[in-house]
Structures are given as structure tokens and as C-alpha cells.
Swiss-Prot record:
The protein's enzyme class: hydrolase
UniProt lineage: Eukaryota, Metazoa, Chordata, Craniata, Vertebrata
Subunit comment: Homodimer.
CDD domains: HAD_Pase_UmpH-like
Metal-binding listed as a keyword: yes
Site features described as Important for substrate specificity, chain residue numbers: 204
Protein name, as recorded: Glycerol-3-phosphate phosphatase
Keyword field: Carbohydrate metabolism, Hydrolase, Magnesium, Metal-binding, Protein phosphatase
Gene name for this UniProt entry: PGP
Superkingdom per UniProt: Eukaryota
GO biological process, one term: glycerol biosynthetic process
Pfam families membership: Hydrolase_6 (PF13344), Hydrolase_like (PF13242)
Record family assignment: Belongs to the HAD-like hydrolase superfamily. CbbY/CbbZ/Gph/YieH family.
Protein residues bound to Mg(2+): 34, 36, 260
EC code(s) of this entry: 3.1.3.21, 3.1.3.48
Amino acid sequence: MAEAEAGGDDGRCVRLNAERAQALLADVDTLLFDCDGVLWRGETAVPGAPETLTALRARGKRLAFITNNSSKTREAYAEKLRCLGFGAPAGPDAGREVFGTAYCTALYLRQRLTGPPAPKAYVLGSVALAAELEAVGVSCVGVGPEPLLGDGPGAWLDAPLEPDVRAVVVGFDPHFSYMKLTKAVRYLQQPDCLLVGTNMDNRLPLENGRFIAGTGCLVRAVEMAAQRQADIIGKPSRFIFDCVSQEYGIHPERTVMVGDRLDTDILLGVTCGLKTILTLTGVSSLRDVKSNQESDCMAKKKMVPDFYVDSIADLLPALQG
């Protein structure tokens, strides 16, 4: 789609050429980056992305990484950033730039699960998610494979439950199973038991245009079975931005959100009053933007970025000039 086709009557979603990028960066202190589909695909860095972030750091820009992926701790994400050449801090400061949904879910539960009994969560998710929860004092059960017990529904419902579970947390879980779903619903029959989803992404992009089902598919399954609506931590929820803002002291008008998804990254930026850049190396396309611009739905009209780039490497000329 040509540049002329991308911009709407309101001047949003224009190609961020070198001249526009220089003007934008002059008014910006902080850049918030999504990771999957923006900085890398799977285990491969987007060409030119490491050099772009190195140049931004050299210009004195503050960087933070906001990911809906709950499969790694902050420290593990920092290690991946370093291994792929993005220059994240090491040592005691490792992970301080990273705001993943595992970490932010832990902050949320620490706020909500006050008082006795001691906080405990049934976790449909990764070891990393459980590690972040346990780091703030929330004990975890349920991580890992959980096959069906018995030979029918009666036996499944008789499977023992842990006492005093105060939250069901749904993240990315390759071991998601009918047994786990059944247990989650049983815990959620207690009205005071929280249902928390790390994010609602429907798919996770990998290399060569491939993708896998995202966490949102699992959250929806639990919501439907339990007839409950989950509290969502990740983008576009404002909670994850508030986590960054509290630690970084962000001024929204001098902050840019860079992402590849209109319904998470760009919507978060618009909702929080940030400047927004869509990169076309991930999920959303200019065709999606145009569809939103032409929609009669006001919610879709909000999911339009200020600028777009083919890749964040398109920022390099402005940084080298």
C-alpha cells in the first residue's frame, strides 16, 4: 500500500521518513518498544534493529521494553536483549528496562491479595510466570503438565484441589489441558477468587510468517467455562503502562510507543496519550490501518498510529544524520 493510501484525513499514519523522524525524536525522551515482531521474530533479531537501539541509546534516549509475553522473567528478557545485540543492562540492574506481563501480573497480585490467608495462585502458565509471582510472595501451584485423572467427568471433578487458592492466573501455557481448565473453573467457583489474564493476544508471530496460538485463546477458554471476565494485565490495559510510568516517571507527551499490533501496542499508546509508531515487521498491516480508518466503529478508529515504518531500522538515517 502506498504512503498516500495509508494516511487518513486526520493526518495520522504517515510514513516516518528521516525528516519526520528527526523532528519526532527531538521532542521525545522515552521510547517504549514491544519485542516480538518489532525487535525480533522468534530467536532472530529484525535486521537493523540492534543498531537502531544502539543509536537511540547514544542519543541519550530512555528505552523500555513492554511485552505481553509471559514466558520469561525480566532477567531472562534482558539476557535475550543482550544476546541479540540490543545492549540491555547486566548485573544487579538486569531487567530494569523490561516490563513483561509476568512481572506486572506479580505487581497486580501483590496489590490485590492483601491480608490473610497467605496469597496463593493456581497458575496456567510458565515457570517464569510463577517465579515472578513467588518473588513478590505469591505461592504458586499448577505449573507444568497436568493430565486427566480418572476415566470420566465425575473423576475429573473429584481431583483434589489446593486449599486457599485466591487467584487463577492464565498466561502462555504450552501444557494447557482439559484437566487444568476444569481445575481453574472449580477454583473460580469461589466468588473471592480472582481471575487474571496476562494478555489477550490471539497469536504470537515467529520467523518466516509463521505464528502460534496466543495467550488470549487460553484466557477466553477459562472465561467462557467459568462465566467470569478476567482482569487483563498486558497491553492495551493501562495497568502495564502505569507500571512503567511509576518506575520511569514518564511524561506521556514526550514518549513514543513502538509496536506491531494495532489492537495492543497502538491502542495502548493512544489510550495513554503517547505518540505511536507502527512497524510492519509483525502482525498488523497498512491494510488493517486503512480498514480501521474507514470503519464506522469509534473503537477501531482509535487503533490508528501517528506514523508507520517498514521496520524500526528505518529510524537509522535520522539517527545517523
